[in-house]
Amino acid sequence: MQGPRSTGDSSTGINYADGEPICSTNSETTSNNILNPVDVQFPNNTTGSGRPTYASSSSHVVQNHNWWSFGESSSRLGPSDHLNSNGSKTDRQLLSDGYGFEEGQSGMLLPGESFLRGSSSSHMLSHVNLGKDMDIGSGLQTSGVVIRHNNCETSLGSSSQTAEERSSGPGSSLGGLGSSCKRKALEGAPSHSFPGESHGCFFQTENGAWNEGLAQYDASSSLSLSMPSQNSPNVNNQSGLPEPRFGLGGGRAVTASAFPSTRSTETISRPGRRLNPGQPPESVAFSFTQSGSSVRQQQQLPATSPFVDPLDARAIPVTGSSSSGDGQPSMIHLPALTRNIHQFAWSASSSSRANSMPEEGLSPWDAPRINSEQPVFTTPANETRNPVQDQFCWSFTRGNPSTSGDSPFVPRAGSSSGIHGLQPNPTWVTPHNQSRISEVAPWSLFPSIESESATHGASLPLLPTGPSVSSNEAAAPSGSSSRSHRSRQRRSGLLLERQNDHLHLRHLGRSLAADNDGRNRLISEIRQVLSAMRRGENLRFEDYMVFDPLIYQGMAEMHDRHRDMRLDVDNMSYEELLALGERIGDVSTGLSEEVILKVMKQHKHTSSAAGSHQDMEPCCVCQEEYAEGDDLGTLGCGHEFHTACVKQWLMLKNLCPICKTVALST
């Protein structure tokens, strides 16, 4: 859907009346060639006494390149994306040294050091680039925003010029600002690539006005402060005072001195720097207050501070009551920054929505280097899309509560704000797991120690909170992280070793306790044996074993002199008995033949006598039956044998072969 083509011009006049700046903008526009134009209404900025008057503009001018965008910070802007203001009324305003414009308006007044804030759903500026050459409209080329400051009047110029012309007068018209209410709702839309422009980043000037290295990255928004050259025709200061030049892509608030908002009680200011290299280094003191704030320049900074706002820059909601009470400001002094931190570029791995850089764009390695004296700040943005409307509860505590002076501060946000502490010593962001960097809350250069300890898988290094940190330590976080990892491993190893030692000691203690119990029982038994010996009681062999358990084994190994006497003859075999008899020898216990014949009874065997003794057994010595007329001998036990057989037996043993009793008594 296209409307009629529009042509028009707009001018802005800035004057001082009664000590207060008054800004006005006249615009005559007719809409043409704008997608779904929506009328943007701008209220009259009438404020109380002592407050600056703001200008408003509703011009719709077609521009070919992205310049100012009040849309979503994560959206990629095409050639038709311009100053996007959906008419939403918020309480945040764009602050300056007495000038500014309220959100919901497309007017712009930047005579001096500025505080910029967006007005869309994300409340951030997506692409803001001041002091750059760019094409605006059809066939027109401007030298960017020319800011002049005079003692009696201030003007903001962005007039249409050719490449050879530059603005030089004390006043100029405000032109080339286009606004469109068509918002890019689809994230990840590819942005238009321009010659000398990094993908979704800053423009490269053709006249060398911005010759210092611009921090660039491949993300949907950016924030950079660059130092223009001293001889740039775009930077003109009639009063001889240094004027700031800001290049803003992330829409974060950048200020060197800002007034409190007329309608917001809370003001959050980001660090700002004057960008004139001819002036001595100066610093900015940061002020975070509840009802109002003033930023004072107190601490020295070495040089300009280019700010890099990576990933999806989200708005920081500043809410509160409409009353503008005077609160007690909390001044935060930024310590001396490191001088040896070089520029780094955000590549395609910096965000899940980031795309690779085009071939015609500037690569991260082709970008000009930042001055070695320029510290680099990195601000991870919040991934949340809707701004949090809770009040901020800032508390600023040092790493050491008892430390005073210029010690590094550790501001921490309250639970309702969801904003982590601002660390004073920036360090590098490791490329590992950079897709999760967007989860870090806004206004946090790096997550605090509490969040680091809560997320163990995080790749961001821990920042020290002690009194001071040297530049070498800040420049080499990888070595410190590796050393800390090794120290943690060493501590864990020592802890495990101590636990093992503790378990070993516990086991040893139990064994010693058991040994002590056994020894106590042994001592008691020895005492009982000794007392029994004193009483003269008969002691058993076990009683003697109490004194020494080895006594029994020694006694078993001793030579037994009566071993042969203790032989178990009854259980021996016949062979063993023969061997034993041969070894022992013959022991004659028998009787002589004369004694046997004299004492032993003899008679003849007859068959009549055999009939009466039918149960008569044969001779036990020779095992033969008795025959008629054989000589038989009768022993004292009554057993009968052949006389020749029994006489030989009795000569060996005086024992009865049957009953083993004494055969003959002499």
Swiss-Prot record:
EC number: 2.3.2.27
Function: E3 ubiquitin-protein ligase that functions as a regulator of MED25 stability by targeting MED25 for degradation in a RING-H2-dependent way. Proteasome-dependent degradation of MED25 seems to activate its function as positive regulator of FLOWERING LOCUS T (FT) and is important to induce the expression of FT and consequently to promote flowering. May function downstream of HAL3 and be required for HAL3-regulated plant growth. Activation of MBR2 by HAL3 may lead to the degradation of cell cycle suppressors, resulting in enhancement of cell division and plant growth.
Free-text note on domains in this protein's UniProt record: The RING-type zinc finger domain mediates binding to an E2 ubiquitin-conjugating enzyme.
Keywords: Flowering, Growth regulation, Metal-binding, Transferase, Ubl conjugation pathway, Zinc, Zinc-finger
Disruption phenotype: No visible phenotype under normal growth conditions, but the double mutant plants mbr1-1 and mbr2-1 show delayed flowering.
Listed Low complexity bias regions: 221-239
Protein name in UniProt: E3 ubiquitin-protein ligase MBR2
MF annotations from Gene Ontology: ubiquitin protein ligase activity; zinc ion binding
GO biological process: flower development; proteasome-mediated ubiquitin-dependent protein catabolic process; protein ubiquitination; vegetative to reproductive phase transition of meristem
Region (Disordered): 1-58, 73-95, 155-179, 221-329, 400-433, 457-491
Pathway(s) this gene product operates in, as recorded in its UniProt entry: Protein modification; protein ubiquitination
Assembly: Interacts with MED25 and UBC11.
Residue spans of biased composition, Polar residues class: 1-14, 23-35, 42-58, 73-88, 258-268, 286-303, 414-433
A Pfam match: zf-RING_2
Similarity section: Belongs to the RING-type zinc finger family.
